[in-house]
């Protein structure tokens, strides 16, 4: 038997993105967003409303980074979604995060979060709240690599459970993509 919930924002895993951009004075700001993902090979799409300070900053600077929130920084990443940059201009400082300027786009990279997708703005539609960025680079700290490749266990990204308003860390490897299903060919 199944239980029907009606229309919900229930997709698993739902990523927890930390989106960062500079304001017109070069001050870094960031926010937590869960509605987003890869929309084309070198594009990322995120749904964020135009009243966010981060949205304003992205529209001004034409660039942003998307870091994966991690289990080590759940509280800090949650705070970035609770506090408004319109009211708290030093959110990153308050939660202890530090930034460096991306080598590839005019946007901040958060040092404490080991993976960042560095993007240039392609478009923003205020009606649908859809922001689209061209992926220019993905940078990953050595602490999240094994043999030069991203190690998901070391990265320890979290996902958002919209039913229960919880965060969960991604689990163990269960198979090999584009390989395990070959037995059915």
Per-region residue spans from a language model:
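Basic, polyanion-binding surface patches
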Residues: 1-185
């Amino acid at each position: 038997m199944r239980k029907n919930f009606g229309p919900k924002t229930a997709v698993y895993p739902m990523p927890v993105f930390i989106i960062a951009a500079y304001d017109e004075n070069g001050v870094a700001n960031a926010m937590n967003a869960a509605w987003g993902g890869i929309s084309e090979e070198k594009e990322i799409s995120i749904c964020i409303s135009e009243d966010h300070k981060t949205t304003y900053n992205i529209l001004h600077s034409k660039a942003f980074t998307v870091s994966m929130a991690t289990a080590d920084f759940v509280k800090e990443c949650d705070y970035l979604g609770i506090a408004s940059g319109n009211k708290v201009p030093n959110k990153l400082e308050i939660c202890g995060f530090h930034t460096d300027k991306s080598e590839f786009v005019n946007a901040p990279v958060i040092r404490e979060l080991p993976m960042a997708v560095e993007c240039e703005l392609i478009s923003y539609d205020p009606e649908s709240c859809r922001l689209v960025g061209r992926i220019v680079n993905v940078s990953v700290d050595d602490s999240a690599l094994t043999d030069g490749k991203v190690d998901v266990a070391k990265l320890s990204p979290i996902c958002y459970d919209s039913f229960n308003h919880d965060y969960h860390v991604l689990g163990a490897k269960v198979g090999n993509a584009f390989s395990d299903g070959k037995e059915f060919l």
